[in-house]
Amino acid sequence: MEKSLLFLFAVTLLSVGCTDAGESKGSIHKEKERSKRQALKHLTVTTIMEQPFSMKSESGMEGFCIDLLSELSQSLGFNYTIKEVKDGRYGAKDQDGNWNGMVGEVLRKEVDLAVAPLTITANRERELAFTKPFMQTGISILLRKEDASENSFLFGFLTPFSKETWIGILVAYMVTSLCLFLVGRLSPCEWTELSTEQNNFTFLNSLWFGAGAFTLQGAEPHPKSVSARIIAVIWWIFSIVLVAAYIASFAAFLNSDSVQTTNIQTFEDLVNQRTLEFGTINSSSTFQFFKNSKNPTYRMIYEYMDKRKDELLVKSFAEGVRRVRESNYAFLGESVMQDIMVAKHCELARAPQIIAGRGYGIAASIDSQLIKQLSIAILEQTESGNIEYLRKKWWDNTCSMKRSAGWNPVQPHTLGGIFLILGIGLALGVIAALIELVLKARNNADQQKKSCCSAFSEEMGERLGTNKENQGAVDSVKS
């Protein structure tokens, strides 16, 4: 009996202990969740004034990052206070090894988050925790168009037509001149005096007549026969269409972005030229990239900027853009932000080459519990298309109505119809000349009582000069 009571007492104590342990574990878990919610309840956020990511407005701040932060706060249920970074910098180590800018404020825990176009780099990743990138970017060259076009090629006037089109035009010109010369020889109406065996359309005259059509003025000699006039009319139509297409294409070329694609298209081109100075933001991730790079070209860029640091490096992106617009200066920076300036300022252009692909992320202290939740929320915003919507909202291209974004030289297939009409016209002209010659031969045959074939052969011989050669051979034999 005593053993039974002891057993029941032990079981009771054990069950009570397990219950207390379970309750304590549950309370610990609830306490952690409560602390997370409290951590997300109100956050202090730092940003930097950079169009169109963050900008001051009458109501406070606006921009891509401001809208993104608002979406994240609604998704995760937190409030925030946003302020501008004190020193106006993104964040880099100074000579004493201390971080400045937004990175420094996060490290010193003056703020909870840095929401800005803050590039994710290895050095920053060692000190901070970053979310998944909300935007991808790289390094490129921002130029002024007149600087970009300064060394444009000498034969730019040939650009409205492609090489194949120019070859086709040259072939058409030569074939038309040859057909005009042939018709001038065959058609009886083109011969001034048959006895002198002279006609107006020699080969040189045919070339001159064809070239004159491009001036829309015409040139002598004027065709007299129906066959020559057919070729002349078709060639004039061809020339008018060609000149109109050239003028339209050349105007589109001058008014398009294609005029900016010149010698400075890569970083190698930038290093090899001597016209433009170039630089970037001091202590920025772009500057650090060139500093740490082992690529010979990139090392040359770093050494050039480092030697004249006070002259070439700027304090902000806005200052870099201003120098590009006002002086012979090329600005090295984030391609995404350069595209914004190109869309806003029509006189600017960005080089095609983009290097050092990287992303923009939200930064927090390395022990922060927020990064995981923020990363998931950013991925949700990306998958839902909201990030793309915000980008279109703030990346408004004010130059799209002022210039043609796309331009291509005229290709042969574009003018295929007029080439076909020219070919048909040339064929009709030659056939008409042969008909004229046949009619002349038939008339001579009736008058001279000869067969049509022999009369046609004589006419052909007179046109081509073979009769004179045969007559000369006969005279030499007789002598």
Swiss-Prot record:
Glycan attachment sites: N79, N282
Membrane topology reported for the UniProt record: Multi-pass membrane protein
Ranges in the topological domain labelled Cytoplasmic: 185-229, 436-479
Keywords of the record: Cell membrane, Glycoprotein, Ion channel, Ion transport, Ligand-gated ion channel, Membrane, Postsynaptic cell membrane, Receptor, Signal, Synapse, Transmembrane, Transmembrane helix, Transport
Localization of this protein: Cell membrane; Postsynaptic cell membrane
Residues in the signal sequence: 1-17
Spans within the Extracellular topological domain: 18-163, 251-414
GO biological process entries: modulation of chemical synaptic transmission; synaptic transmission, glutamatergic
Residue ranges the record marks as coiled coil: none
GO terms, molecular function: AMPA glutamate receptor activity; transmitter-gated monoatomic ion channel activity involved in regulation of postsynaptic membrane potential
Cellular component, GO, one term: AMPA glutamate receptor complex
The protein's role, per its UniProt record: Receptor for glutamate. L-glutamate acts as an excitatory neurotransmitter at many synapses in the central nervous system. The postsynaptic actions of Glu are mediated by a variety of receptors that are named according to their selective agonists. This receptor binds domoate > kainate > AMPA > NBQX > glutamate.
Subunit structure, interactors included: Homomeric.
Name this protein carries in UniProt: Glutamate receptor U1
Species, as recorded: Xenopus laevis
Phylogenetic lineage: Eukaryota, Metazoa, Chordata, Craniata, Vertebrata
